[in-house]
């Protein structure tokens, strides 16, 4: 049985494979050895916009295929830590989902309430 998160992630990957790139609602990051340096930009954009999905461990340049050697557990923790570096703190749903023999990290970032915006990287400030 496939859970709802795995089904949604698979649906998004199939769409991105068809169109050849990630979308305004879904950002893909390889993150083989460490979390992407632009992850806080993505968290901010989705939190201040209309929300979105993040998939870690997937290679856009290799046709949206799983990254060999990706450590889902470590990257799930790194993503959680990145969320803590935001003001206000981003509280996504983060799950590990199976896909084509690998585990990927899948996160849903909700739009923040108007009173909580702007969401920004704490160290950079609201105009960073």
What are the residue ranges of the model-derived segments?
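Conserved N-terminal catalytic/coupling substructures associated with nucleotide/phosphate chemistry
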Residues: 1-128
């Amino acid at each position: 049985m496939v859970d709802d998160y795995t089904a949604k992630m698979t649906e998004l990957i199939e769409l991105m494979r068809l169109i050849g790139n990630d979308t305004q609602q879904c950002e893909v990051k390889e993150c083989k050895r460490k979390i992407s340096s632009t992850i806080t930009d993505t968290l901010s954009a989705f939190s201040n916009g209309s929300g979105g999905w993040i998939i870690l461990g997937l290679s856009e340049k290799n046709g949206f295929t799983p990254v060999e050697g990706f450590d889902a557990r470590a990257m799930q923790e790194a993503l959680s830590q990145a969320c803590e570096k935001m003001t206000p703190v981003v509280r996504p749903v983060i799950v590990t989902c199976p896909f084509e023999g690998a585990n990927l990290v899948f996160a849903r970032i909700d739009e923040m309430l108007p009173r909580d915006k702007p969401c920004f990287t704490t160290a950079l400030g609201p105009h960073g």
